[in-house]
Structure formats: C-alpha cells, structure tokens
Design a protein with these regions (language model features):
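Polybasic, low-complexity association/targeting segments
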Residues: 1-25
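Acidic-glycine-rich active-site phosphate/pyrophosphate-binding loop
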Residues: 6-11, 38-55, 122-127
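Active-site flanking loop/helix segments enriched in acidic
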Residues: 16-27, 36-42, 130-134
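A short glycine/serine-rich beta->alpha loop
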Residues: 19-26, 56-65, 134-138
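Short cysteine clusters
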Residues: 31, 67, 116
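Phosphate-handling active-site elements
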Residues: 42-52, 79-99
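C-terminal binding/interaction regions
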Residues: 96-175
Length: 175
C-alpha cells in the first residue's frame, strides 16, 4: 500500500520552519535537533524519542564528520517517507533512497560541503576548540547554515509533493 504524505497547505510553512530552526539553534544548540524539531512542530509530529535519537548527531556526529544539516534532512525524509517496520524489507527502503541522495547533493551545493569540519574549521572532538567556536562570531555562520538548510529541505519536500513523489510504503499495521 502506498500512502501519500501531505505537507501543510499554506505557503508560509517553509519560512516558519527556517526561522524556527534558526531560533532553536541560537537558543538551544544542536544543528540536527534544531532543524528536526522545527519540522516536527510544523508537521504536527510529537514524539520526544525522535528528538532524543538525534541527541549525538550535532557537530558532525560529535566528531566533525557529516554536517548536522544533512543528517537532519535525512531524518526528516525518514520521518515522512521511511519504512514503519523492518519487516517491510527493501520495499520499505526504496521510496526514501533516491530522494535522500538528491537532497544530500542539494544541501552540499547550498552549504558548500557536507563536512562539518570543512564548514566550521573545528575539530569538535577537541573540547577547547569546540568551546572557542561556540563563543566566537564564527558560530553565526552555523546559525545561517541551519536556517538555509531547513529552508532547502522544505523546498525539496514541496517539490517532491508537487512531482507526486512524496509517499511511503505502508506496513501491514499502517493505517
């Protein structure tokens, strides 16, 4: 069974997600959680376990690897298009694979890299570097990357919906 995923009807949801992600990052840190929480709020998804699951994904997987904006994009796609049950096997995975690959490319082009270390110049495994970065004006660039990334994810979701490609394969227990 294929289930279409519906996005908010009003056109103002993407700017709201962008602004909320920026504000979340400014006030609470964690690029991944800031974006994820913004989309969850806008889409009416209330599950603290999802936010908790992203707890160690900021700062490039807390190791300056993959940018948290990219990780958040993959998580948002997974929330909307991912399989509900492992038993769905590959059939449940396929709907999200190509969109996720496309989104990763778009985010990399938008931000200039997929690497947290390349974007920030910080090794987040070095606590002194991390503290200096968080207290510096360079941190402002991450706030903008979070906002830009959230907007790009929203635009991408809207395009998928317009192309009829925003769907998930329902599991045996799906409604």
């Amino acid at each position: 069974m294929v289930d279409r995923v519906a996005l908010p009807g009003s056109g103002g949801w993407i700017p709201r997600v962008r602004e909320r992600a920026h504000e979340n990052m400014r006030r609470h840190e964690s690029c991944t959680q800031s974006i994820l929480a913004s989309f969850m709020e806008e889409l009416g998804i209330r599950d603290p376990w999802v936010i908790r699951s992203a707890g160690a994904l900021h700062g490039g997987l807390v190791s300056s690897y993959t940018c948290g904006v990219h990780i958040a994009g993959a998580m948002v796609l997974g929330l909307l298009m991912g399989r509900e049950e492992l038993e769905q096997g590959s059939d449940g995975l396929f709907p999200v694979v190509f969109p996720a690959q496309e989104l990763m490319g778009r985010l990399t082009r938008k931000l200039g890299s997929h690497s947290c270390r390349e974007l920030t110049g910080v090794d987040f495994t070095d606590l002194n570097q991390a503290i200096r970065y968080l207290a510096s004006s360079e941190r402002e660039k991450c706030l903008e990357r979070v906002a830009d990334g959230a907007e790009e994810i929203g635009l991408f979701l809207k395009e998928l919906e317009e192309r009829g490609e925003l769907f998930r394969v329902g599991g045996a227990k799906s409604s």
